[in-house]
Amino acid sequence: MQQTKKLTHSDITIAVMSGPFLQRGEPALVSKWYRTKMALACGVDLVVELPYAFSTQKAETFANGAISILNALHVSEICFGSEDGQIENFYNTISVQKNEEETFNRLVKQFMNAGNSYAKATSEAFLHILSSEKNIDMSQPNNILGFQYIKAILMQNSSMQAQTIKRFASHYHDETFNDQHIASATSIRKQLFSENSSFTEIESFIPKATASLLASYKQNYGTLHNWEQYFSFFKYKLMTMSPENLRHIYEIEEGLEHRILSKIQTSSSFHSFMESLKTKRYTWTRLQRACTHILTNTTKEEIYCANIEQHAPYIRLLGMSQKGQTYLSKNKKKIELPILTHTKTFDHPTLHIERKANSVYFSIMKEPLRTQLLKRDATHHPIRYDETTAKFL
């Protein structure tokens, strides 16, 4: 965050944040409201939500949704972390892909026909068409997402400028901590759910406010969220579904329903299920997203009706600092998308999916807490934060 502000000299900082389920196809550790508090306490001025129809998607769709929201908010500059760290290399890579589009598409098809996943096929195709050191490594997850952010900016004819900060010492999927006080999201998650885990092991890797709010969430609600907590319901749901039912679920393609229904029979945990399910053709992340859609019962028709090929249909405001509130007041008339401070009275197919996702996310809570949290989510007004006193209002 501090590096972003230093690099961009920004007047205000806006974060677009996923809701209950994330791009890797897994539940967020804590609710979006707690994560909003974390962001505000760490210097973000406006926190807005990326709808489920974008947040649980491949990088291209995820980026399109995020950029459309930032564009609507009249953001002048975007900053993202990447393994490469040189913004010129991203633009060079986009230029090469555009010039070699026919060859690139042919190579992707060729590698997929050989049994590779789409992600692996695209990575291999890029290896074949990119020869200069001034191009990015498209096998790295943050490079891929950054590449799609810039493509979305160009596709949406936005005047937004892009900057990137090099990630170092820890990669996104690293499962262990290093001695440089930098940790991946994966390693932090693994530590939090390990036997006899405590927050002391991660305190040196995350901001103090984040550690405090994580501990507070666990104390107040008795849990942090991960896939294993949803597995019993997930397995029961699959055991009562036919292949025909499953085929209606978004991202269930090419006979995947038969493999899923076969492997669930002998799986006693989500991890063991995923280990038996993954293949060369389907990456872990791709399968986790499909499982998330099964869990939330999100169908192909629902996603189609939500118009995910278009831009985000609204902006759900989750939180704001005093500076962020001033920015919104000054620019509200220029912002073309509706800004939602709650969802109680607004209606849209995208929001229907969002409500289902929230219901599933809180399903692991005991009653009456579960019902209270669901009701509160629809009526919850944006969290306000006074950055001068470092207090929530």
Swiss-Prot record:
Role, per record: Catalyzes the formation of N(4)-acetylcytidine (ac(4)C) at the wobble position of elongator tRNA(Met), using acetate and ATP as substrates. First activates an acetate ion to form acetyladenylate (Ac-AMP) and then transfers the acetyl group to tRNA to form ac(4)C34.
Localization in the cell: Cytoplasm
Transmembrane spans: none
Protein name (Swiss-Prot/TrEMBL): tRNA(Met) cytidine acetate ligase
Listed InterPro entries: Rossmann-like_a/b/a_fold, tRNA(Met)_cyd_acetate_ligase
Lineage, uppermost ranks: Bacteria, Bacillati, Bacillota, Bacilli, Bacillales
Binding annotation for ATP: 81, 142, 167
Keyword Membrane in annotation: no
GO molecular function, one term: ligase activity, forming carbon-nitrogen bonds
Keyword tRNA-binding among UniProt keywords: yes
Reactions catalysed, as given in the entry: cytidine(34) in elongator tRNA(Met) + acetate + ATP = N(4)-acetylcytidine(34) in elongator tRNA(Met) + AMP + diphosphate
